């Protein structure tokens, strides 16, 4: 059973990984040609840097012991394996969680396409990979306060049950979506989107086939 669970987990991780090029193609198709390289590099870099940062720092914060944030065991998979103890190989579980983190990070890229400096996007990648995603993920998947089933816990006293997210609709997509909303609101529309009269102008993408 453990072997089958491991195979299924790695298969699911592979499918989630392919969301990364999927988002990249969607964004590249809906933007102008001059910004294609910038968007593709953002999607590549947030996966590369985000994976390394989550591996070294975020994973420990997300699955360490604690209510608000996990007590980290940085660079120590053996210690994390004893804490998580889900019957799955810790290396495979790390890969599985890493691609989820990368997906949450790359969701934001499309909402801020053509309006973000590459250097500032790298700063954002650091924050979501080592702080925002691990902390919010800890609340739901890492034993934090949202999944605390003790009789006197906040969730049990208030709702009579704990919070469940079976596939990342909140931990991954909602977190990425809220960050994207805030980023888009701060940045505002793309240059040239509105004329002096306030009317909206269409900015056609380069390829609906890619999108």
What are these regions (language model features)?
Residues 1-211:
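Hydrophobic alpha-helical transmembrane bundles of multi-pass membrane proteins
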């Amino acid at each position: 059973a453990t072997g089958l669970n491991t195979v299924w987990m790695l298969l699911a991780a592979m499918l989630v990984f392919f969301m990364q090029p999927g988002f990249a193609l969607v964004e590249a198709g809906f933007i102008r040609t001059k910004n294609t390289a910038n968007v593709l590099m953002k999607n590549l870099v947030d996966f590369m840097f985000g994976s390394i940062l989550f591996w070294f720092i975020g994973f420990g914060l997300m699955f360490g012991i604690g209510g608000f944030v996990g007590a980290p065991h940085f660079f120590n998979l053996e210690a994390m394996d004893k804490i998580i103890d889900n019957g799955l190989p810790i290396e495979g579980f790390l890969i599985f969680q890493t691609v989820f983190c990368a997906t949450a990070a790359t969701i934001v890229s499309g909402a801020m396409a053509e309006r973000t400096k590459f250097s500032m996007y790298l700063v954002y990648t650091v924050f979501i990979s080592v702080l925002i995603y691990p902390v919010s993920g800890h609340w739901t998947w890492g034993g934090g306060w949202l999944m605390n089933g003790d009789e006197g816990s906040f969730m049990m006293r208030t709702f009579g049950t704990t919070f469940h997210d079976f596939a990342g609709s909140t931990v991954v997509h909602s977190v990425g979506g809220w960050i994207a909303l805030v980023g888009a609101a701060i940045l505002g529309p793309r240059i040239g989107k509105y004329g002096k009269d306030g009317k909206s102008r269409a900015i056609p993408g380069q390829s609906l086939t890619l999108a």
